[in-house]
């Protein structure tokens, strides 16, 4: 009920009533060993949106940081607002709060780890699509010439060859092939006609797709925890208080098997029992955890709180001292021992540890604990540490390949390749590229001049032959007049139009024709990161509400603007780069 009063007291111009309700809620939270009411900021923000004072909600949300210090969305939203208003001091404070919440709130870390993995996967997929299409367009003229050699007995073989090459692009799309599988196929089609720098782009795209495959397995592994963390599931006990969280069936639902996960589930269940007002059940759970061994400082501290609540002050003090000896810089155990000494009127012992206790709780970022205000025997519980969750997640990642075979990413990006064959399929793309690079030194294949578009048959390194002799000699349309000059002029004009069209539709293509492979790859990475950020944030902005939805909406709008700017820059840069190459070889600026 007190949390509801805080939500109702929030509003523009209600600073003093809200402060009063926040202080009352904080006292109630200490009584139940609740560290943070993470649902409060979202409730207040939703109310502000409904009642039309969203833009004036900053003061209210700043006030509730004292009762929702582990709310990562709250700190991130405040940091965004401070950056927009150029409040440097508040911004730095909010960044400290954000980092502190990420370090200490395990469910928050899970959720943001999922978001980062989705962002990385989306960016990698966009890079693979961008790279594969640009490389296919780069190789298309030479590939069409080689396919036309297969139809040399037919009239106008180049028409049939163009249809075959177009089918190589369109058939995977029409058949519903996953975008990752299609990208590998397109890169494989282009491999024989690429320079070394372009092969690096294709190989990087293939490696990133393997990373996407592994990310799918990783997300599949942590989905049972991340999906229930914000709804008050087994890991939600550190930031939310729900009456049914203490149910053992709820605490273990969706949990991965293994001793690490089972211990973490019991830790969260014991914290939920503390919050739910069941000290005897919590004491039993903490005792069981301590008997198992491992990292015991937090368990000792929490059991000490429970025992003090049960009137077992001596036993509680022993637990606090044990926790302080195991983790001297922890802060919580020293403060709790100090409070217990005061309750027992052991003033000498209290005075001895007072400086350490006061300094310790001041350093517990993002918690705004002020010793001079805490005069009612407030005891500070220990949360489930993020380090435990993160280390255990790394253990789960060893099984990521097995999980990836049945993940949603496999069905979405790699169909119809069977899950067990995806690594072999991606490796085959690499082997194919290596074999064609070796065979190209022995097999005569078509090559197209990067400057004028003239085709020829070459064998060996493409770097030495991708500028024709006429362009090296800078003879323009040629020395001879008549039909030969007209044919060369038409070839130059068509090639120029083709590259310019590619530069507009697929930014960066013109720079590839200009021979700027590594700079083009860096540009593609920036474009893909912006597109990936837009993809993930747009989805989250539509589905999520509260502070997260508001921030995601701002992010996808900024990301969309970045994509538009980068697209225009890439088109102009590619156009200009190719124009510079043609000017250098004396084939630009002429009109038919």
Regions found by a protein language model. Give the residues of each.
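Membrane-interface segments at or immediately adjacent to transmembrane helices
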Residues: 19-39, 47, 218-310, 315
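Start-of-helix register in tetratricopeptide repeats
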Residues: 39-42, 73, 264, 298, ...
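Hydrophobic alpha-helical transmembrane segments in integral membrane proteins
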Residues: 195-202, 208-244, 436-444
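Transmembrane helix recognition focused on a "late"/terminal membrane span
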Residues: 98, 396-451, 467-500, 520-592
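TPR/TPR-like (Sel1-like) alpha-helical repeat modules
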Residues: 66-72, 79-105, 324-325, 331, ...
């Amino acid at each position: 009920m007190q949390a509801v009063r805080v939500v109702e007291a929030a509003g523009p111009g209600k600073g003093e009533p809200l402060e009063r309700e926040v202080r009352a809620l904080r006292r109630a939270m200490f009584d139940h060993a609740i560290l943070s009411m993470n649902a409060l900021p979202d409730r207040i923000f939703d109310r502000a949106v409904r009642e039309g004072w969203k833009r004036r909600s900053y003061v209210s949300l700043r006030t509730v940081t004292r009762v929702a210090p582990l709310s990562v969305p709250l700190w991130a939203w405040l940091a965004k607002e401070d950056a927009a208003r150029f409040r440097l001091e508040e911004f730095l404070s909010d960044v400290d709060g954000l980092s502190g919440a990420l370090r200490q709130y395990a469910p928050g870390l899970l959720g943001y780890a999922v978001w980062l993995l989705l962002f990385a996967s989306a960016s990698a997929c966009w890079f693979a699509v961008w790279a594969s299409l640009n490389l296919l367009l780069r190789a298309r003229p030479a590939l069409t010439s080689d396919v036309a050699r297969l139809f040399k007995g037919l009239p106008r073989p180049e028409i049939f060859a163009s249809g075959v090459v177009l089918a190589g692009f369109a058939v995977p799309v029409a058949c519903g092939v996953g975008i990752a599988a299609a990208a590998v196929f397109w890169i494989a089609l282009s491999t024989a006609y690429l320079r070394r720098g372009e092969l690096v782009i294709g190989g990087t795209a293939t490696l990133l797709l393997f990373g996407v495959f592994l990310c799918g397995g990783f997300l599949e592994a942590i989905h049972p925890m991340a999906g229930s963390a914000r709804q008050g599931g087994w890991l939600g006990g550190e930031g939310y208080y729900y009456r049914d969280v203490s149910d053992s069936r709820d605490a273990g639902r969706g949990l991965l098997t293994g001793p690490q996960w089972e211990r973490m589930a019991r830790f969260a269940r014991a914290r939920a029992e503390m919050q739910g007002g069941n000290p005897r059940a919590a004491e039993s759970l903490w005792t069981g955890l301590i008997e198992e061994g491992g990292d015991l400082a937090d368990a000792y501290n929490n059991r000490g709180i429970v025992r003090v609540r049960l009137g077992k002050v001596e036993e509680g003090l022993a637990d606090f001292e044990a926790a302080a000896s195991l983790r001297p810089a922890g802060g919580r155990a020293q403060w709790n021992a100090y409070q217990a000494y005061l309750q027992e009127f052991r003033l000498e012992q209290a005075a001895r540890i007072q400086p350490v206790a006061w300094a310790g709780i001041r350093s517990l970022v993002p918690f705004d604990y002020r010793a001079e205000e805490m005069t009612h025997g407030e005891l500070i519980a220990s949360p489930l540490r993020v380090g435990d969750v993160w280390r255990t997640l790394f253990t789960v990642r060893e099984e990521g390949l097995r999980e990836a075979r049945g993940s949603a990413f496999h069905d979405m990006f790699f169909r119809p390749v069977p899950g067990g064959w995806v690594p072999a399929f991606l490796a085959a793309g690499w082997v194919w590229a290596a074999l064609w690079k070796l065979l190209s030194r022995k097999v005569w294949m078509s090559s197209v001049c990067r400057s004028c578009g003239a085709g020829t048959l070459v064998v060996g390194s493409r770097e030495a032959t991708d500028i024709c002799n006429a362009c090296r000699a800078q003879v323009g349309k040629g020395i001879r007049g008549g039909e030969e000059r007209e044919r060369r002029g038409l070839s130059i004009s068509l090639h120029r139009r083709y590259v310019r069209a590619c530069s507009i539709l697929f930014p960066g293509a013109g720079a590839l024709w200009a021979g700027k492979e590594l700079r083009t790859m860096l540009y593609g990475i920036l474009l893909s990161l912006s597109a990936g950020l837009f993809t993930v944030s747009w989805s989250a902005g539509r589905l999520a509400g509260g502070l997260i939805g508001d921030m995601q909406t701002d992010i996808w709008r900024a990301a969309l603007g970045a994509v538009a700017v980068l697209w225009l820059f890439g088109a102009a840069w590619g156009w200009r780069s190719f124009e510079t190459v043609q000017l250098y070889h004396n084939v630009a600026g002429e009109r038919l």
